[in-house]
Amino acid sequence: MLCPPYPDRATDSNRTGFRSHILTHEILGIPVHLLATDRKRRLNNVSTVSHLVTNELPFGCIQQTDLGISTASPLYSLFNLASHVDENHLVMAMYEFCGTFSVFRPSPVVEALLDSIDSSELLPRSFGWRRVKSSSGRKTDLWRREPLIELGELGQFADAMKSERGGRRFARAAKRVTGVTASPFEVQASMLFSTQRCKGGEGFSGFVNNERIPLSTSARRIYGKSTCYADLLFDVPNGASPLIVECQGKVVHDDYDSAISDSDRTTALQQMGFTVMPLTYRQISDRANFDTVRRMVARQIGVAYRSKSPKEIRCEIDLRRNIFIDWATLGR
């Protein structure tokens, strides 16, 4: 176990052990947000902020841990964000929880602990999270894991909580999640393409995220694998070639070997009749560059692109300001 259990409250009446615990001090950060079901048990000070819960919670909203504390489930954690963060940030958090990635920047103390555990092999390689390293072997803040929430669960929970405070905003945000993504880059691209024009996006519908594509025999010979996944796969009308937008993040696409692999993959997909559009972070983060990208996508999917009105441009600038952030600070 990376962290020891919290001290029992009976032996930690002044909560010194709670405040100094590695999970509190080095991972969660101060203040820690607590759920309280009784007004008399609310605790608000420098290190904790209490949120009063007066209604009965749906089953599964509170989960037990091996650390001597109970925690809000991923779904209920997201729901509690709905009243406190920008809607775009809520959508981004939903993408992360429903996706196969997390962004976690360890403090120096936790980094040293991870190094010691890794060198001593105390944690199995299949313990749940795998850190992504760059092509040069550099550690990153990006981690791989299984989704914390299924997309269907998100929709069902949104329907169940509509009448609660923040429920309508939560439901709106949930409907904006287009699929399962594998990186912040894929989330940002998905939001730019799918968000309604009146909210700053392009309003392109009809694409799915990380669609599994079984390769043909000839495509397998080119790429050396039996399947691949399309980051964004657009369904193109009138029998035209389906469009795949590939998000080529610098972390794993920054060396010669990666370039060769990407080229083989693109050729294999083109051999099967797909149109493949590589997309770099610079192309979406720079608004002038993205103008070329969105017009290319519109042309490929058979949409007559219409220039944005001054109001739509202001909404786009606001959307970009919200999504192009340091992802490690999301929700804070």
Task: Go through each PLM region and give its residues.
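Short gly/ser-rich loop at a beta-strand->alpha-helix junction or flexible surface loop bordering the NTP-binding
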Residues: 1-165, 309, 317-332
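Surface segments flanking catalytic/ligand-binding clefts of nucleic-acid enzymes
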Residues: 137-332
